[in-house]
C-alpha cells in the first residue's frame, strides 16, 4: 500500500537515523577508485555524469579519460567542431548526449554554472544529473536519485510503491532528501550509489555481509527479490498477415 511521506517518516524514523551513518561507514571502506571521484571540478564531473547516463562505469572509464584529455575544460569543448566532438564520443552511442554537451558548453561562455537552477537548465541535464553535479562539485545538499538509490531505499525501508509511478517518484525523492547527510552530501550520494552497485545489487545482493541487514525491512520480510516494484505495463505489438486465396474451377481426377 502506498504511504504518504509524513506517514513514511513516522513509521521509519528510527531506521532513518542509522541509515546514512552506516552507509558512510561502509563507503569509507569500500568506495570505488574512479577518476571523476578525485576532483571537484564541475566540468569533469558533468562529463562523467553524461557519459554514465547510458553507459556502464567499466565501459565509460577509458572513454572519459580520452574525452577529457582532448577537451579538458569548457572552453576547449565549446571551441571544437561538432564533428570532432562526435569523433571522441564514438563508441559510446546515444550521440544526442554529445550534441547536448557541445551545445551546453557553448552556452556557458567559458564558465561552468554554480547554482542548481543554472546547472539543471543545461541541455541534456535532468534532476538526477543536476543533483549529482551540485553535490559532487559544490557539496550542495541535493539528493541524487538513480536506479541504485531507488533499489536501496525500496529494499531497506520496505516500500512497495512502484518506482516508475508519479507517486513513487515523489515518495522516493522526498525520502532520499530526508536521509541525505546534509553535512556530507557528496560522500553520501556516492556512498548510496556505490552501495547499490556493489552490495545491494539487482540480482544476488550480498545480504549475508550487509551492514544494514539487521534493520532492512525487505530482508526481514523476505521481499528482497521483489523490490523495487515497477508498474506492470502490457506491451502490445501489432502483427500484420497477408493471405492469398486461390480458387480453381478445374478438378483433378486420378
For the regions a protein language model found, what residue spans apply to each?
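Short, positively charged and aromatic/hydrophobic N-terminal segments
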Residues: 4-7, 11-12
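Catalytic cores of DNA base-excision repair glycosylases
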Residues: 15-206, 212-221, 225, 238
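Short Gly/Pro-enriched turn/cap motifs at secondary-structure boundaries
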Residues: 233-236
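Short beta-strand scaffold segments in enzyme catalytic cores
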Residues: 242-246
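Conserved small/polar residues in nucleotide/adenosyl-binding loops
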Residues: 249-254
